[in-house]
Amino acid sequence: YTFLKGPIVIYGVEEVVHDLKTHVFNNKIWPDFTQIPLPDGSEPTLKFVTVEEGVPFEVLGLQITPIFVNHPVVCTGLLVDDGETTLAFTSDTYRTDRFWAEAGKMPNLKAVFVDVSFPSTEEALAERSGHLTPHSLSEELVKLAAEPLIFAVHIKPFFRTAVIKELSALGNPRIEVANINREYFF
């Protein structure tokens, strides 16, 4: 807090910003940091910026486009473009169409970081909770009109070994498990 040089900025679609203000930063669950100034008093500690689904916005020179995905609560995947390379992040999602269609339109799509939380034996749980399995991922990738690298993320720790084994069994050399301690360059 004392080292912040500006407010922490949270970007989100209207529904997400509303829910964060109503249910988290409400002085019951967590302080309303939009009302707490930085130590120098210049600005609030926290700032929300509402963005529109499908409409690019800029952060630090990057064009970011939020795309709604299929999840029990409002969630967006992100297309992030620096003018030379596009990366896609599904966020929490189950089977979805628009995200893959929009990602596939990006001429410089280099990688997709995709939620693969459960093994295929837990397909019913994955569907109810809005996440992919290796099997559903393989079916989803057919929708992608590009062949970027695919990095599996958000693997539930209890199922990590099974998910990794199943991803390997897919035999797709473009798919790997993202490493938390690795920096990726594209």
Go through each PLM region and give its residues.
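Active-site HxH/HxHxD metal-binding segment of metal-dependent hydrolases
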Residues: 1-40
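Short active-site oxyanion
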Residues: 5-9, 85-87, 148-149
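A short helix-to-beta-strand connector/capping loop
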Residues: 6, 37-47, 60, 146, ...
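Active-site-adjacent beta-strand anchor residues
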Residues: 9-13, 89, 153
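Structural signal for conserved beta-strand scaffold positions within catalytic alpha/beta enzyme cores
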Residues: 12, 48-50, 66, 152, ...
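Hydrophobic pocket-lining residues within nucleotide cofactor-binding pockets
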Residues: 15, 69, 155
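Core dinuclear metal-dependent hydrolase active-site scaffold
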Residues: 41-102, 184-186
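Cap/insert and terminal regions of metallo-dependent hydrolase folds
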Residues: 94-185
